[in-house]
């Protein structure tokens, strides 16, 4: 399984982040067989939140690398991706396994 993780900066406008999250989720659902797509709600907690860098997190799971790459290269993802990166967000893609 593969996971896309997007960390939006705390300094970003909340309404803009909400719109981007909706756009990314819609794109991922339309372009690939994405599994659950989740987002953080409320304030981030834990040691990493103390640094204050990230304010919101989006996660999307994909069964295969091909599905993930299809989603990340989809035409309707390119605008939300560019806007997300312009905010200073960080986008990760990585393989995961259950322990």
PLM-predicted stretches and their roles:
Residues 1-70, 94-99:
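Short S/T/G/P-rich N-terminal loop/turn motif that feeds into the first structured element of a domain
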């Amino acid at each position: 399984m593969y996971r896309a993780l997007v960390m939006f900066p705390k300094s970003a406008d909340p309404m803009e982040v909400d719109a981007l999250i909706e756009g990314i989720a819609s794109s991922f659902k339309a372009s690939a067989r994405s599994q659950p797509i989740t987002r953080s709600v409320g304030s981030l907690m834990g040691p990493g939140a103390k640094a204050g860098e990230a304010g919101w997190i989006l996660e999307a799971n994909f069964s295969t690398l091909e599905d993930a790459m299809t989603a990340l290269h989809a035409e309707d993802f390119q605008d939300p991706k560019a806007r997300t990166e312009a905010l200073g967000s960080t986008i990760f893609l990585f393989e995961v396994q259950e322990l």
